[in-house]
């Protein structure tokens, strides 16, 4: 073995990874079936994340997805938590699907779309009549000139490329943007995927139930990405007021929260009234109005100070939502009554220890209970807020913008026309990548215009030029 043979083998050894990428891995990544399969999987798991509630507590899944009976025979709370269906969009396998799909699109762009664009920007002049026979659409005219053809093509927004050396040859094209469109579509989809991945890695979701008049900071984070930043503690949010608008039949029409953002000194730096589909946004964090509840009730016994008692949501076994609390009517707490409320319309039901309805009182009214005057001053509502931060949203929106732009660009047909003047004969031919019928009609109209022009005038025009 010579030194040259040894060096050659060493070079081949180092070339193996590159050859594997080009010959084995790249054809798989650019395979259309793989891209379609990945897209279907992403769509299926995305819909799963929409159907199955995301970011809830383990107790929620245990209550709604029990082991016996299992939903569809297999879907239980254990399966949901093991597979990660309670946080689909942050699981390693879902992010891996996004990365693989993005890699496939990128590889396809570099191996197919970019070479196709470069090929579309290169052309050869047709110098022989036989070359026009290869085109799908061609014609031979005995009265026509390149000068007239060039003018007609320019009126139809074709870009003319005459041969500088030979004046009897012409090439024209339009719609090259249609070749760029698919590349822009791929860039847009990749941007959407990158935005989704970045949002999953750096975003978070929190939930807060805040009573009217309370101030809070974002602390109850239920789901967060591994790279999510800590929420700054130099600002807080105050719920100035929470209220519900009811329909004449007693149903809920809309619920509102009047909210203020406070700085460290307690000064208001932002203010907004939020309701469903109209959130508050501050420093990249969005506060959505999603739920409501009853936080407490303010009562007074005879002429005593005013007490604010908390109310808890009772278990009604799916028969609606009712909040309740217990109010002592004697100093030694030996006797008392239960107060129940189901909405914020101010109606409070009073029950004795035996479960008998004693009275029904509206806010601002009073009643006698166990020899004590009990006055219901107010029922205090609480707003349910879903708080999200997703730094990937601007990237996703930009990706959708590029996607729509690319789709529009792709509708432009890339049309090409060649022409050759041989004595009195004019050879014209063309092709397009889409809208073949419209292109044929356009070329036929151009040929009709050329044929209708007198031959003598064409010669005179050519001499003048």
From Swiss-Prot:
Keywords: Cytochrome c-type biogenesis, Membrane, Thylakoid, Transmembrane, Transmembrane helix
One Pfam family hit: ResB
GO cellular component, one term: plasma membrane-derived thylakoid membrane
Compartment annotation: Cellular thylakoid membrane
Membrane-crossing segments per the record: 32-52, 91-111, 180-200
Membrane topology of this protein: Multi-pass membrane protein
Gene Ontology biological process terms from the UniProt entry: cytochrome complex assembly
Function (record text): Required during biogenesis of c-type cytochromes (cytochrome c6 and cytochrome f) at the step of heme attachment.
Subunit structure comment from the entry: May interact with CcsA.
PANTHER family hit by this protein: CYTOCHROME C BIOGENESIS PROTEIN CCS1, CHLOROPLASTIC (PTHR31566:SF0)
The protein, known as: Cytochrome c biogenesis protein CcsB
Gene that this sequence comes from: ccsB
